[in-house]
Amino acid sequence: TTRAPREGEVDGVSYLFVSDDRFDEMVAQDRLLEWAQVHDHRYGTPRDLVERHIAAGDQVFLEIDVQGALQVRSKFPAAHLVFIAPPSMEELERRLRGRGTDSEESIRLRLANAEGELRLKEEYDECFVNDDVDACLASLIAYVERFSEKKEEDRL
C-alpha cells in the first residue's frame, strides 16, 4: 500500500508499505496480481507471493476491496469470493467513528465507497453480514472448511 502505517502496523506483516514511485514501478512491471485506488491510497497484492503459494498447493486468502476481488476473479475464475457486509450503513458509520483514526472527510469517502461496493456484492460467491464478529467468523470458517473438504475430494 502507498498509505502510511497506522499505529501498531508492521511493514511486511500488516502490509508492504511502499512509496508512490515504487508502486508505479510494480504496476509497470506487472508485479501485482491486483491493485486498486481505495480511499486516497493504492493497495495491491504481489503476484509472486500468491503464485508461490498456489504452486505449493496452499489455499490463499486475500483481504481486498471489490475492485481487487473482481480483478482476481478475472485472472482466477475458480477463485471463491466472499463479501463481508456491515449490518447497515448506520452501523458502519458508528464503527468508523469509533475507531477514532479517520477524519470527517475520510469517513464520508469510506461510506460513499461502501455504498458502491455493497451494490456489487452479487458478484461474490457468498456474503456474510458482520453483525456479530464471532458469528461472522464462525460462518466464514465453516464456509472455508466446506470448500477445503471439496478440494480434498477432488484430489482423490
Q: Where are these predicted regions, by residue range?
A:
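Residue-level signature of catalytic and energy-coupling elements of molecular machines
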Residues: 23, 61, 92, 114, ...
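Glycine-rich S-adenosyl-L-methionine
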Residues: 104-113
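Conserved phosphate-donor/acceptor-positioning beta-strand/loop module used by diverse small-molecule
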Residues: 60-65, 74-98
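Conserved catalytic network of the ASCE P-loop NTPase/AAA+ motor domain
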Residues: 8, 52-55, 73-77, 119-121
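ATP-dependent small-molecule kinase phosphotransfer cores
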Residues: 3-60, 67
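NTP-dependent small-molecule kinase module
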Residues: 78, 94, 98-102, 116-156
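Conserved nucleotide-binding/hydrolysis micro-motifs of P-loop NTPases
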Residues: 2-5, 66-68, 86-91, 133-135
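A short acidic, helix-capping loop that chelates divalent metal ions and anchors anionic groups
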Residues: 4-10, 91-94, 100
